[in-house]
Amino acid sequence: LPDPLTFKDGNPVKNAPEWTRRRVEIVEDFDREMYGRVPAVTPPVKWEVTATSTETVGGVPMITKQLVGHVDNRSYPLVTVDVQLTLATPANARGPVPVIMEFGFGPRPRPANAPPLPPPPPEGTWQEQIARKGWGYAVLVPTSVQADNGAGLTRGIIGLVNKGQPRKLHDWGALRAWAWGASRALDYFETDRAVDAKRVG
């Protein structure tokens, strides 16, 4: 692997301003070789709360919202992208709360002869631990943004922006598209009074 503290011309990074310049080179390498480039223009997303329920998580009453982020597809109506997001926040919070967001891929099929899953840890699931801290949690389904296979690259957000055409060599791939979807979820959090959008992890 290239030395992160050595410029492409072979000179070492000696101080913070030089590191800022070297970081630009590293980001460019990742854009070109790993994740691809986000298009200069991407469509807006309009969020809709499709269901709201109250449930108890780790002994804490939580308000859970199911959301769909409708990606504007007027530029290419043959591809529809609806981003799936779940947001749960404490029902009795006195103000906006921090939120931990994760990617959720749903239950995976298990063979009939698979050993049973281990029980949750004594301190509870991650959602229960977060709820007991008085925080919220969110689960974004990344495959609702972009499928995790090559066949899906003419669909999802990549297919929508490319108007159904296959991606080019340096176009964004699924991981970069998922990050774009997470950023759109952050946009929604900024509009939800239950969420402290400056404290999302």
Label every model-predicted segment.
Residues 96-201:
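Cap/lid segment of the alpha/beta-hydrolase catalytic domain
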Residues 2-91:
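Non-catalytic accessory segments flanking enzyme active sites
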